[in-house]
């Protein structure tokens, strides 16, 4: 509530004993709870309908919500300029509980997705007699098949089942399958377990991205999405550090090789995170029963998303699919994510690991540790692009700039016969690829915010289609038996072509299409009103 409004309320409630509470709010006293201020302003409404409106919409906050898009503050700001202290407190709670669990869950997801590569390079290949076949590629393939099947349906389920039950349940289920891999002796056993890991992991990225979009404003999303995805980068990096440490200190303990211990430790790390999510994940604003949110904060959370044009979830019927498949967003963003997947950017850390192993110049701990530098570049790029895209209020220019960097790195991969140190530097620089995921996810949340079911389905469909197209592409162009140069299959030149297509589509195509469709929507609205 603004200062003048609170002063009027204070004057009107002097006889009701509410002045101390409202006066404290005027001073910006953060110790006054939202419930107290809400109760005070509600008391005003007993004799004044105008005050009732004021109390319902501006209690403990500013009367005008921060506008979506960029503000006038500095480049690096966590809250939009003009955000009230009470709303900042709400956002802090969301960051502390919602965002923290999201990051931890995605950390485990990426840890579990990358562990098989670290295990493969740390003795699993030799102990189980893998190679010169494509066992590692097939492990990736079965994982992707599971994600293709699981992601869209998981994200539709999350619109009717409380996320705080669904997401931790999926986390525990896929972690149980990860644990099972420590007993595997054949490639077929790995394939089965990797399929089920992918099936339940498919709920993580689209489900959490959907839930974040239910709580945060459009102008807040890119920064949070970037932090969320960066946690996955840390998961990839930590997998290398953990495998290196286990190889040094646990190899042979309990009769188990170090690569088997990796799967056991990954499961142990997942258990407390799943329990944390069960008790602290806040569901969605219209359904939340989070113990750490007071009544005013729950109302404010609903008001925040309503002001962004987002509606409560409707019933799930055929009309939902009609809305989805007649929209431009489903095709534009699914194509964008498919092109990103076909760059095989998410596998470059794996190929870097195999490259280091092929040189025969590095120890097992070094082979696991050095590729994490790629993750560090990924981390910094996500943070930077998140802030920049929020500041300028556009995703296209950022995608175009990052795409130009990727065109350079993939050109070096295509040439290949370059000095060893240059090739290593290019592998590391290629870490910029990862920022596309939060940029595209934030873009979807921005464009589809008014229709939560469409938004949820598109996020899931992006994951599934991305996995579907990369399965045959990875098998044909990037078989592990041809790693790391992939000369016979022309892997790197093929990926370069998709990098160029990705850069043009996300940097130029989607922004032009978005502007055209928004103008058309305004014309249709004007004609309808006429």
Swiss-Prot record:
Q: List where in the cell it is found.
A: Cell membrane
Q: Name one GO molecular function term.
A: transmembrane transporter activity
Protein's membrane topology: Multi-pass membrane protein
Residue ranges of the region described as Disordered: 41-76
Respond yes or no to whether keyword Transmembrane is given for this record.
yes
Q: Which PANTHER family does this chain map to?
A: PERMEASE-RELATED, TRANSPORTER LIZ1_SEO1, PUTATIVE (AFU_ORTHOLOGUE AFUA_3G00980)-RELATED
Query: What is the protein's name according to its record?
Result: MFS transporter PfmaC
Organism from which the protein derives: Pestalotiopsis fici (strain W106-1 / CGMCC3.15140)
Organism lineage:
Eukaryota, Fungi, Dikarya, Ascomycota, Pezizomycotina
**Name of encoding gene:** PfmaC
């Amino acid at each position: 509530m603004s200062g003048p409004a609170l002063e009027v309320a204070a004057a009107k409630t002097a006889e009701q004993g509410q002045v101390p509470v409202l006066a404290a709010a005027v001073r910006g006293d953060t110790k006054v709870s939202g419930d107290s201020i809400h109760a005070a302003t509600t008391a005003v409404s007993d004799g004044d309908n105008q005050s009732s409106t004021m109390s319902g919409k501006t209690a403990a906050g500013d009367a005008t919500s921060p506008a979506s898009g960029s503000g006038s503050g500095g480049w690096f700001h966590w809250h939009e300029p003009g955000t009230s202290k009470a709303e900042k407190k709400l956002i802090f709670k969301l960051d502390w509980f919602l965002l923290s669990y999201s990051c931890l869950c995605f950390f485990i997801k990426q840890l579990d997705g990358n562990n098989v590569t670290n295990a493969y390079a740390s003795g699993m290949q030799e102990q189980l007699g893998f190679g010169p076949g494509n066992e590692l590629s097939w492990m990736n393939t079965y994982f992707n098949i599971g994600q293709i099947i699981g992601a869209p349906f998981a994200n539709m389920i999350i619109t009717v089942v409380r996320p705080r039950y669904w997401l931790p349940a999926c986390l525990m289920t896929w972690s149980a399958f990860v644990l099972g891999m420590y007993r595997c002796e054949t490639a077929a056993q790995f394939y089965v377990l990797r399929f089920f890991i992918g099936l339940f992991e498919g709920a993580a990225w689209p489900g959490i991205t959907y839930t974040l979009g239910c709580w945060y404003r459009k102008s807040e999303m890119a920064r949070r999405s970037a932090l969320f995805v960066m946690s996955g980068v840390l998961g990839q990096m930590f997998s290398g550090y953990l495998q290196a440490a286990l190889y040094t200190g646990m190899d042979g303990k309990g009769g188990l090789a170090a690569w088997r211990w990796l799967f056991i430790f990954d499961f142990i790390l997942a258990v407390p995170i799943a329990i944390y999510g069960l008790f602290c994940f806040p569901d969605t604003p219209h359904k939340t029963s989070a113990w750490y949110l007071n009544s005013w904060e729950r109302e404010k959370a609903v008001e925040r998303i309503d002001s962004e044009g987002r509606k409560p979830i409707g019933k799930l019927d055929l009309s939902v699919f009609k809305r989805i498949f007649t929209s431009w967003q489903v095709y534009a963003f699914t194509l964008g994510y498919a092109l990103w997947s076909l760059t095989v950017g998410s596998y470059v850390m794996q190929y870097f690991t195999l490259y280091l192993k092929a040189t025969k110049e590095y120890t097992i701990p070094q082979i696991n540790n050095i590729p994490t530098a790629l993750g560090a570049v990924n981390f910094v790029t996500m943070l930077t692009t998140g802030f920049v895209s929020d500041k300028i209020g556009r995703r296209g220019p950022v995608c175009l700039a990052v795409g130009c960097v990727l065109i350079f790195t993939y050109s070096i991969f295509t040439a290949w016969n370059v000095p060893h140190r240059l090739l290593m530097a290019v592998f590391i620089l290629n870490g910029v690829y990862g920022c596309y995921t939060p940029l595209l996810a934030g873009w979807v949340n921005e464009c589809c915010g008014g229709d939560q079911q469409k938004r949820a389905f598109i996020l899931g469909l992006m994951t599934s289609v991305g996995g579907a197209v990369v399965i045959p592409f990875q098998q044909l162009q990037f078989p592990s038996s041809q790693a790391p140069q992939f000369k016979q299959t022309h892997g790197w030149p093929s990926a370069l072509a998709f990098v160029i297509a990705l850069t043009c589509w996300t940097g130029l195509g989607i922004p032009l299409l978005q502007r055209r469709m928004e103008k058309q929507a305004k014309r249709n609205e004007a004609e309808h009103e006429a």
